[in-house]
Amino acid sequence: MADLKQVYHDKVVPELQAKFGYSNVMQVPRLQKIVVNMGVGEAIADKNFLNNAIGNLEAITGQKAQTTYAKKSIAGFKLREGQAVGCRVTLRRRQMWEFLDRLINAALPRVRDFRGVSEKAFDGRGNYTMGIKEQIIFPEIDYDKVDKVRGMDICIVTSAKTDDEARQLLAGFNMPFRKKEGNNG
């Protein structure tokens, strides 16, 4: 596996410069951060669920997870303001590149019935958000020690101004986008 940062500088930057006509290397879109968020609704009843989720997230990302708290009370969910409801990790620099490399080359191919990630998950400002239904697709998670299968949100923040620039940037890293299906008659 080649270092993704090196791939970015050697392959992706020249391709994007040629395609979009950037006159300066600094205009080329780049990754800024990756935010991995895990909501743990069961933490309201039992704090052990949150501790297990934090342990899983730290194993996956290699960085200490931050606990997230409820902003306001919702009686229907038996939720009080300030109660712990999840955890998140913000990855930058080396950890960001390593996580993206593991996500693309190791984790996503292990998803059941995987046909590629959606091309419609861009937010209009060059950021890409995807949801993962099972944390067990990551090789760092021991399947036998998992108490409950949880999902997570992964938000890839880029400096791209448009969705097309961000799509080309991620495609340069071999992000497996879903192929468009044509009419087979």
UniProtKB/Swiss-Prot annotation:
Q: Name one Pfam family in it.
A: Ribosomal_L5_C
Q: Which GO terms describe its molecular function?
A: rRNA binding; structural constituent of ribosome; tRNA binding
Looking up InterPro entries in the UniProt record yields:
Ribosomal_uL5, Ribosomal_uL5_bac-type, Ribosomal_uL5_C, Ribosomal_uL5_dom_sf, Ribosomal_uL5_N
Cellular component aspect of the GO annotation = ribonucleoprotein complex; ribosome
Q: Tell me a GO biological process for this protein.
A: translation
Q: Which UniProt keywords apply?
A: Ribonucleoprotein, Ribosomal protein, RNA-binding, rRNA-binding, tRNA-binding
Q: Please describe the quaternary structure of this protein.
A: Part of the 50S ribosomal subunit; part of the 5S rRNA/L5/L18/L25 subcomplex. Contacts the 5S rRNA and the P site tRNA. Forms a bridge to the 30S subunit in the 70S ribosome.
The record's function comment reads: This is one of the proteins that bind and probably mediate the attachment of the 5S RNA into the large ribosomal subunit, where it forms part of the central protuberance. In the 70S ribosome it contacts protein S13 of the 30S subunit (bridge B1b), connecting the 2 subunits; this bridge is implicated in subunit movement. Contacts the P site tRNA; the 5S rRNA and some of its associated proteins might help stabilize positioning of ribosome-bound tRNAs.
Family, per entry:
Belongs to the universal ribosomal protein uL5 family.
By its UniProt entry, which NCBIfam families does this protein fall under? PRK00010.1
In Swiss-Prot or TrEMBL terms, this protein is called Large ribosomal subunit protein uL5
Taxonomic placement: Bacteria, Pseudomonadati, Pseudomonadota, Alphaproteobacteria, Magnetococcales
